[in-house]
Amino acid sequence: QTLEAFYNSIIHSNPLSVGLNCALGPKELESHLIELDRISEFFVSIHPNAGLPNAFGGYDETPESMAKFVKKWGESCYINIVGGCCGATPEHIKLMKKVTEKLKPRKRLQKVKHMRLSGLEAFNY
């Protein structure tokens, strides 16, 4: 299912936030975040892994490298809520907070009144 089709399937519940969590690191989640920013009438959250698991089951994304992604997303006003998932440590979270604490949050889009359907793909009419 595409991200927009998933979004269409949950908007009836009027969530506080729609977000991306786990499965991927910040580099791999970025294109999905940009798409979510484009379509979401709700706050946007993101909680990336500290990269993809390596051969030893660990995560190679450093706090500094994750903070660079988060800072870019914050400066682009893509996010309202940010955190970490698999492999993220207290140091990752500390740096995310530091790079975003003075940035303006993403503004919610105006609600669009039209039919939004979902299957594997979104259909908006």
Predicted segments — roles?
Residues 1-125:
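Domain-level signal for soluble alpha/beta catalytic cores
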